[in-house]
Amino acid sequence: MPLDLGALPRRAVLAGGLALPFLAREALAAPRALTFAVFRNGTRIGEHHIAFAGDDATLTATTDAVMTVKLGPVPVFKYRHHAVEKRVGGVFASLVTATDSNGKAERVSAEMAGGAIRISCPSGTITAPANANPITHWNPQVFSTPLFHPQTGKMLKVTTRRIEPGHWAIRGDAEIDDWYDAGGAWLSLKGKLDDGSAVEYRRV
C-alpha cells in the first residue's frame, strides 16, 4: 500500500503505494494525480493520494496515505505515510519517506550513486542494483526490475507476472494484484495482509 500495502503487517508493499521506475508514457499522459479509497475487509479505513509534478525529463511523485483501523468506535491502528520520489529521464534518482505505523516511526532515503542505489533505512545501509525501484504500484514497468520496500528500505523477494493486459500479480513477500486502465494509469489494487485480512484500493 503504501498500504504500504505496503502497512498493516504485509506492510507497505503497497505502499505504499511511491513510485516506479521507467515512467510509462501512458501513465504520465494520464492523470497528474491519483486518489484511492482504501478498504480493509470491505470497510473503508483511509485514503492514498499520489501527485505528479514535472515531465518525462524530471518527474516528482509525492505520496500521502492516511489510514485508521477501528474496533467498533475505537481506533486500534493508525497509519500515516509520506514519500517524495524523483526520476530523471525516466530513471530512479531518489526517494525520501517518513512513516508513522501505529506510533512506530520509520524513515528511508535512497539515491542513485556510483552505479548503484544506496538505501538508508532503520536496519542500516543497503546497496541495491542500479536498476532497482521502490514498489509503489502506479507504474507497472517497474515490475520487471528488482524492487525494494519504500517504508522499510529492504529488498523484496517477489515474483511478478502479467496475468492479462492491465492486470499484474505480485507474489512472495507481498501478495498483491494491481490493475491499470486502458491508458496505463493505476486503477485498483487487491492484497492480503499478514493477519489474513483483505485490503483493496479503489480509485476515486
Q: What residue spans do the PLM features occupy?
A:
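N-terminal secretory signal peptides and thylakoid transit peptides that target proteins
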Residues: 2-19
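Short, aromatic- and cysteine-enriched interfacial helices/patches
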Residues: 3-5, 22, 72-76
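C-terminal segment of N-terminal export signals and the immediately downstream linker at the start
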Residues: 24-45
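Solvent-exposed helix/loop surface patches that form functional interfaces
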Residues: 31, 88-89, 93-204
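Generic structural detector for well-ordered beta-strands
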Residues: 37, 49-53, 86, 111, ...
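Short coil/turn motifs at secondary-structure junctions
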Residues: 41, 68-70, 90, 102
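Short, surface-exposed coil-to-beta transition loops
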Residues: 45-48, 78-82, 104-107, 173-175
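N-terminal, post-signal-peptide region of Sec/Tat-exported proteins
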Residues: 48-84
